[in-house]
Amino acid sequence: MSCGTYKRGSLTFLLVVALAVPVFCQSRTRLKWKTRISTTPEVMVEERALVRNETNNRYVKIYSTRHPKKTAISNATSTIDFEKRKVAIKVRTYVNSQRTEACYLMDPINTHDMTMTVNVIKSRNQTQVIDKTAVMDMVVNSNKLTIDDLKKDYELSRIYKECDKAVVESGLYTIIKGTPSASATSTDPPIDVLGLIPQSGIHSQHIRIHFNTNPQTAPV
């Protein structure tokens, strides 16, 4: 084997490795699940849930920020006029097996951030117990999936496991279901997002939702 042949073979091998590393890293990135600690005094922790939308394969980042010292925050949503389309976010909360729900109009989709505030009032003397069956049915029915589908899908299987975890911890969870409002004029596929956000031991919740329109990449 000549020196030139050896060099060409080495370069080919290095080229293959260089092309394979980004693909491997991207596949690994999709499995990341992070918890970030904020340095802001009013904000204790920011948690992230990554959920895949079955309708149009969009990825959604759901951020929840805890405000343990605040007892009540208005239900007003902050609107950002990026485009004319609005999305109604329906929030269902289970407290002692009793369901309460509220709808919020959100601006807009694509790669922009939106904020909304959800009130969660919790009495220190009251025990919050989540209804596992009701939550499981809600998760399944809202996306028209079966339990087996939840177990097969990586992101949705995390939601499935969180339902079990919620019962063990006797925590309070909010289910977020987003659908287009009646006034939506966009011809894009409907947004249908689902998320479980842990709210055990907190009074109010500030939620930031980010939509990623690229189905090939998940947010990191």
UniProtKB/Swiss-Prot annotation:
Keywords noted in UniProt: Secreted, Signal
Species: Margaritifera margaritifera (Freshwater pearl mussel)
Protein name per UniProt: Uncharacterized shell protein 11
Signal peptide span: 1-25
Compartment annotation: Secreted
GO CC annotation: extracellular region
Main location: secreted
Distribution of this protein across tissues and organs: Nacreous layer of shell (at protein level). Expressed primarily in the mantle with highest level in the mantle pallium and lower level in the mantle edge.
